Amino acid sequence: MLRGARSHLPASVAPAAVLAAALLSSFARCSLPGRGDPVASVLSPYFGTKTRYEDANPWLLVDPVAPRRDPELLAGTCTPVQLVALIRHGTRYPTTKQIRKLKQLQGLLQTRESRDGGSQVAAALAEWPLWYGDWMDGQLVEKGRQDMRQLALRLAALFPDLFSRENYDRLRLITSSKHRCVDSSAAFLQGLWQHYHPGLPPPDVSDMECGPPRINDKLMRFFDHCEKFLTDVERNETALYHVEAFKTGPEMQKVLKKVAATLQVPMNSLNADLIQVAFFTCSFDLAIKGVHSPWCDVFDVDDARVLEYLNDLKQYWKRSYGYTINSRSSCNLFQDIFLHLDKAVEQKQRSQPVSSPVILQFGHAETLLPLLSLMGYFKDKEPLTAYNFEEQVNRKFRSGHIVPYASNLIFVLYHCDNAQSPEEQFQIQLLLNEKVLPLAHSQRPVGLYEELKTHYRDILQSCQTSKECSPPKANITSDEL
């Protein structure tokens, strides 16, 4: 096992990191089922925001703690001086709303009329133990903690200078107030503890040198603090028109008819929301327990593509390119990231140590998607609508590929010693889910930091959250007073 982990590590990784990788890898394989993935579903690529991180990064199915060094990751005379990471929480339980819909669906199955030679799938589901409870309500599961510990170990091995023992007390952590994010940040710190102290049990997060994460919902849940978004999108009954239209469209009706026949229930007792929660239950059982749920047997790949598109439509219109405010509401977070990078540049120019070499921010898919949209990523030529499912089969915007559980967007700032000019001293790379993300303005894997700032000048200088998020004032005439 140690040889397997070592073969993926750069030569600069300390032996302690290798030992930690081996120990955590051993723990990972013993603690949860399904790691060899004999139960991996053919439906896994279509689970959208409920996708396991390892399904978006298949090399982790072989060894979940071995870092994969992207060949385009900058090396040589350029040294990383700061890392700013935006991280989605790890695998979670379904929400109470989803669990109640699942109970409703199971109730339909248990009261259906049994038929001779009936569906074995329906019979299996009627007997399927419903182990989800309302108390779970989106909380982080043990697999989600493992997602975070393993991510911490891989990043520490990939950037050993930044995650050095000396920098530990200078780590800066920010989190959403949601328990799944707070718990994810704590699990990440536990993974770092394993990196620094292989084999020793981690202390309580409050006792760690770097201190507990700081809650900042204005950054991590900016959408809750943007009145224009809340008015125009969140509370607007017509904002998700294309989502609702697709639910009653021909593609979804075909799935509905097929599922009703499989479950042996009247078609009018089902709707798109119940079908979707059944599909997600397949994903939850796989992600949380590593088991093949009988709910997976209800669907085939054609059904999965339709249900993935339904989920992507919601993400597109509520969190991405559907409405301008979706992305513009994240300006404050984007600017905050560049404030950290600017400060690191300034400190290096003054030959001072970088005060915050690693900044870790824990949020949601709803945090990452608007920011990536603001930066211009995963934008298709035509918008996703209720009526172009077939045309969008090869779309860029697939939420499961972009923001699975534990997804991460990482900004890495480098200082290059042999630069030909002052502008070339500082270069930057972006990583999405540990893979180099080409810069939007050049499609290159690395670029000058100042060039990136120039490309995003409008957002950095002109996007003011107070103005962007202010709903338009009502035009009241004197006759209306």
From Swiss-Prot:
It is an enzyme of class 3 (hydrolase). The keyword Hydrolase applies. Transmembrane segments: none annotated. GO terms for biological process: intracellular monoatomic cation homeostasis. It holds the Pfam family His_Phos_2. One of its GO terms (molecular function) is inositol trisphosphate phosphatase activity. One of its GO terms (cellular component) is endoplasmic reticulum lumen. Glycans are attached at residues 236, 475. N-glycosylated. Gene3D superfamilies: Phosphoglycerate mutase-like. Residues 1-30 form the signal peptide. Belongs to the histidine acid phosphatase family. MINPP1 subfamily. Multiple inositol polyphosphate phosphatase that hydrolyzes 1D-myo-inositol 1,3,4,5,6-pentakisphosphate (InsP5[2OH]) and 1D-myo-inositol hexakisphosphate (InsP6) to a range of less phosphorylated inositol phosphates. This regulates the availability of these various small molecule second messengers and metal chelators which control many aspects of cell physiology. Has a weak in vitro activity towards 1D-myo-inositol 1,4,5-trisphosphate which is unlikely to be physiologically relevant. This is Multiple inositol polyphosphate phosphatase 1. It comes from Mus musculus.
